[in-house]
Amino acid sequence: MLRLFRFDVLETSTKDTERPNSKSSRLSSTSGSSHPSSSSRLTVRSAVPEKSAFGSIEFIFYFSVILSILTIACFKIHYVSSPKHPNYKNIEKYLKPGWLFGQKVDSADFQYSAFRENMPILLLVIIVYNFLWRLVKLVFTKNTNDELAIKNNYRLCFSLLFALLVYGTGVIYVLTIALINYLISKSLKNSIFNPLLTWTLDISVVFFKEYFAYCKFSSLHPGLGFLDQYTGILERWYVLFNITMLRLVSFNMDYYWSLKHNSEKLNTLIFDKDREPTTLTFRERVDYSCLDEDYNLKNFLTYIFYAPLYLAGPIISFNNFMSQMKYPTVSTLKYRNLLYAIRFLVCVLTMEFLLHYAYVTAISKDGNWNQYSAVESAMISFIVLFMTWLKLLIPWRLFRLWSLIDDIEPPENIVRCMCNNYSAVGFWRAWHRSFNRWLIRYIYVPLGGSNHSILNLFIIFTFVALWHDISWELFAWGWLIVLFILPERLCCFMSRRTGLTKHPYYRYISGFGAALNIYFMIICNLIGFAVGIDGIKNVLVSFFLTLKGAMSAIAAFIMFFSAVQIMFQIRVNEEEEGINLRC
């Protein structure tokens, strides 16, 4: 049972150790300071007790506080979701018949509801994909030793068919944009116009993607009108194009850097330095360039349309993807994929339980906050945020599980529970981890890294908001995160400069600041992903400007402080095991 929750179930590269003379170590030493919050790790180490203390009276008190408040929260959520509540009649329209003990299910989140309904189809596709591969392997690999080449051809063929099934003739638009990107990279090579045109084209498509709704084949030529009838499962191909855009930039930039800097090749590392391919670290697979001939059209199309990761990610760079097509990763953990599948199932069942017993999404969608007390509003908001985290986690892990079964290991998008974060930067690293790594590699470091950190953070989170969708809520979310990151970084810097980190009570001082940080992060993410700007006004007024609300805010702060002390200790235990997630 304990094996199920080991970190190497999530990611093979989590416990990779960098070799002191490797290129990855040199890159780490130069770019580590360029990371948006390399200082946050120091805060953790300084702020924690030196040995595990979960059995001490202090930590028993912390656990008691958290358990007490969570018990109250459960009763409150059960009440607001029951027919006894006065506002139940207004949220009932968002409820559908469920399968769990006669309870109705909350279907107010249309995006997750659509995924939930189509999950059996996706599972069937995964089974068919692996069955067909075994059939192809049986037929075509009898007289050849080049099994990997055949598998890569199979990946390409299936991925193109999968894209056609999903988008129908809309895949023609995606293919056209992809080929234009490929022509840019191949014609401009190491010219500065390669990245300039790549970024201009792809950001323009993301920005104006809604206009593609009005673009029909019949408007190009009446004879092409029949193509408009075959729209596929997802009629609007441009809705999920954002993920494809990241891959297009990755291919062009990796190819550009391989030529521009005459980067050392991965094959050189393996053969000239006598390295076993199975010992390659994640960083080495990303930083070392592929051979020039690997940046070809077939590999490009396989990477862009790779079926397991096509719809939602996680994001994997072209260099990493190509290296794994040639030298697959090997986990040292027995039955790793099975354990990962069990963890995925636990997440799905947790979500199902919440959807059947906590109708917080329906309450949030209804928006009638006046019907709820300050405590209830706070509990509803927190559970909405937790379910937002879960609704992203589940699709990411399903598609990543498919990829793992296919011997391609992308980064794990979420390595910590939402409730196990106290740093704004650490939270971002652990929330959409593969996207965070993409941002660092393709935006933050090229723009100068920590030399212009504040400006770069503003640019990055503006891009992230634009990438998600063009809305004031998301722009407010991005800019508020930058605003809240600045005092966190300033406090970390001043603590080290003044020697406060050596103070015996620094753990408690740091815990106080981290508890405030949690408040800020909850507010930001509620604005961006849950209740919006209008909704957050009602929550904040009821929570901070009423007597009962203020008392609840104090109780929540005590719980956050207690939780932070436990988070500190968790990270101490991880470091003792050689795990440093830097979040």
UniProtKB/Swiss-Prot annotation:
Q: Which UniProt keywords apply?
A: Acyltransferase, Cell membrane, Endoplasmic reticulum, Membrane, Mitochondrion, Transferase, Transmembrane, Transmembrane helix
| Active site, per annotation | H468
Q: Which residues lie on this side of the membrane: Cytoplasmic?
A: 74-119, 181-191, 320-343, 395-444, 487-512, 571-583
UniProt GO BP: GPI anchor biosynthetic process
Q: Is Transmembrane among this UniProt entry's keywords?
A: yes
The cellular location(s) given in this protein's UniProt record come to: Cell membrane; Endoplasmic reticulum membrane; Mitochondrion membrane
Output compositional bias ranges, type Low complexity.
22-40
InterPro entries assigned to the protein according to its UniProt record, in alphabetical order: MB_O-acyltransferase, MBOAT_fam
Q: Please give one Gene Ontology molecular function term for this protein.
A: O-acyltransferase activity
Extracellular-facing ranges: 1-52, 141-159, 213-298, 365-373, 534-549
Specify where the region named Disordered lies, as residue ranges: 15-42
Entry's Gene Ontology cellular component terms: cytosol; endoplasmic reticulum; endoplasmic reticulum membrane; mitochondrial membrane; plasma membrane
The record, for Pfam families, names: MBOAT
Q: Which domain of life is it from?
A: Eukaryota
Question: Transmembrane ranges?
Answer: 53-73, 120-140, 160-180, 192-212, 299-319, 344-364, 374-394, 445-465, 466-486, 513-533, 550-570
Q: In what way does this protein cross or attach to the membrane?
A: Multi-pass membrane protein
UniProt similarity note: Belongs to the membrane-bound acyltransferase family.
Q: What does this protein do?
A: Membrane-bound O-acyltransferase involved in the remodeling of glycosylphosphatidylinositol (GPI) anchors. Acts only on GPI-anchored proteins, but not on free GPI lipids. Also involved in lipid metabolism, having profound effects on sphingolipid-sterol-ordered domains integrity and assembly. Involved in cell integrity and apoptosis.
What protein is this chain from?
Membrane-bound O-acyltransferase gup1
Q: What is the lineage of its organism?
A: Eukaryota, Fungi, Dikarya, Ascomycota, Taphrinomycotina
Q: Which gene encodes it?
A: gup1
